[in-house]
C-alpha cells in the first residue's frame, strides 16, 4: 500500500512496486487479511464476503470456502455479533474469494486466545494446503511461523537474516 524507499516487489515476473512504479492495489492480484480482520461493521458476513472484486465470478469457490471454514450459519450476522475466530475465518474467505496469486496476512492469529488460536491455526493450515496458495504471513510468534509455513524468512531492520524450511 506504500511506495517503497528502496527495493521492489515482483509478482509473476512483473514489477508491481518500486521507487518509480506503483501499481494500484486493486490491480495487483493479491489480497490482504489485516490483523484486526477489517470487516465492514455495517455489512453482514455474507455481504463482507461478496464485497471483493472477483466475488461475483467465484460463487462456487466462495460456497466451498464457506463450507471449509464452517461459517455458513454466520452469513446473516454482523461482525460484532460473532467471535474473533469467526471474524478471522470470514476475513479469510473474503480475501480468498478474489482468488489472488498472493495472499498477505498480517498477524492473523494475534487477536485470538490460546485455545481458539490453536483451532484456527489448524484450520488455516488445512485450508491453505488444500488451495495450494502462496501466502506471506507477518508474525512475531515463532510457533505460528514454524507451524503454518513451508518456508520462514527472518528480517531485521528490513534486511534478510535467515531463510529456512521449518522441520
Predicted regions, residues:
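Conserved ABC ATPase "signature" region
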Residues: 14, 57-76, 125-132
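ABC ATPase "signature
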Residues: 163-164
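A short, proline-enriched helix->beta-strand linker immediately N-terminal to the Walker B motif
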Residues: 97-101
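ABC ATPase NBD coupling module
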Residues: 16-31
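Conserved ABC ATPase signature
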Residues: 78-82, 86-88
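Catalytic Walker B motif of ABC-type/P-loop ATPase nucleotide-binding domains
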Residues: 103-107
